[in-house]
């Protein structure tokens, strides 16, 4: 029997909410965020909101503490730990960002269960501000999946295809767990 690889979405699959909205709402920046997302890509809006939060004295530690209060899907932590202990290879493909995902996974003792996290990059700059960038180039990104709704910053289908090819080469079966439609017809 082939080994198993489980690919998780993060928001609304591991986390019982959207991590971006959790932080934006938690610090009272919902109105600004909604205004920005009506005129620009989601990641660009998040980066601007992070700049506004930083300029108002909200620190990276404040953001981390907010994220640590975000609720997980019931029983997901034990499910992840059991799957990992049984030898399943676990990965994440998410339109969230590195800082948010890693902060939450580490807080719940789940970070080491995952062999790969595919998401939007984020860095803490020299001023201590969280910067969020798109996973794929907004100008040259083209979606290969069967989803017309892939955001311009991340084609999950492209990432899943790479993971799938790697899994097939290593004789692994893939299980995808997410809150939306299946990313590719072949998954």
Place the predicted regions along the sequence by residue.
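C-terminal cap/substrate-recognition subdomain and adjoining C-terminal extension
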Residues: 74-81, 85-89, 96-187
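Alpha-helical substrate-recognition element adjacent to the catalytic core
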Residues: 2-121, 125-126
């Amino acid at each position: 029997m082939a080994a198993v690889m489980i690919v998780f979405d993060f928001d609304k699959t591991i986390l019982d909410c959207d991590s971006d909205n959790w932080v934006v709402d938690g610090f009272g920046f919902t109105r600004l965020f909604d205004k920005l997302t009506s005129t620009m890509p989601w990641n660009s809006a998040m980066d601007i909101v992070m700049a506004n939060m930083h300029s108002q004295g909200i620190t990276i530690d404040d953001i981390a503490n907010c994220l640590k209060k975000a609720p997980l899907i019931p029983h997901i932590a034990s499910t992840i730990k059991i799957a990992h202990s049984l030898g399943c290879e676990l990965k994440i493909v998410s339109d969230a960002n590195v800082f948010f995902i890693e902060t939450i996974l580490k807080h719940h003792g789940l970070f080491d269960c995952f062999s790969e996290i595919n998401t939007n990059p984020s860095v803490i700059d020299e001023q201590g501000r969280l910067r969020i960038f798109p996973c794929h180039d907004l100008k040259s990104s083209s979606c290969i999946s069967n989803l017309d709704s892939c955001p311009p910053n991340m084609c999950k289908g492209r990432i899943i295809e790479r993971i799938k090819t790697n899994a097939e080469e290593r004789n692994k079966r893939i299980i995808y767990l997410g809150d939306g439609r299946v990313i590719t017809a072949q998954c």
